[in-house]
Amino acid sequence: MTGAAVSVCLLYALSVCSACYISNCPIGGKRSIMDAPQRKCMSCGPGEQGRCFGPSICCGKDVGCWMGSPETAHCMEENYLPTPCQVGGRPCGSDTVRCASPGVCCDSEGCSADQSCFAEEEGDNQIGQSEGSNSADVILRLLHLADHTPPHRVHQ
């Protein structure tokens, strides 16, 4: 074989195999990340009452959710830690989406309103129905308004 053919074969083999390189290998090799115990995601928000759901999302059961605000700045550090974290709450969609706050379902990309996240709150909380539903209704209305706002306003 010629040198060019050997080079092409080598480059093809290199692109097909899945290797981790020195700059992005986890400690212990690429398979060690699967064996590592999952840890809770970092706490965030006022009084550290919330948990990070993504680099700019902080949610807590009693405090609601923040997205892209100063309360979420601490969550950026999660990107630099070598082991993955597991957020609390029960699944409310796919494997990566979890109940973050009463009526709110989040993953690392964003949040949405989800009625199934109220069931967890009702079972855990013994306060009156009207007291718990008022804050949940406000959250749902805010999420609803955020989903339906136009991308820009046309001034007349």
Curated annotation (Swiss-Prot):
Leader sequence segment: 1-19
Intrachain S-S bonds: C20-C25, C41-C85, C44-C58, C52-C75, C59-C65, C92-C105, C99-C117, C106-C111
Disulfide bond found in the keyword field: yes
SMART domains for the chain: NH
PTM summary: Seven disulfide bonds are present in neurophysin.
GO cellular component: extracellular space; secretory granule
Gene Ontology molecular function: neurohypophyseal hormone activity
PANTHER family, per the entry: NEUROPHYSIN, VASOPRESSIN-NEUROPHYSIN 2-COPEPTIN PRECURSOR
Function of the molecule: Isotocin causes contraction of smooth muscles.
The protein, known as: Isotocin-neurophysin IT 2
Species whose genome carries this gene: Oncorhynchus keta
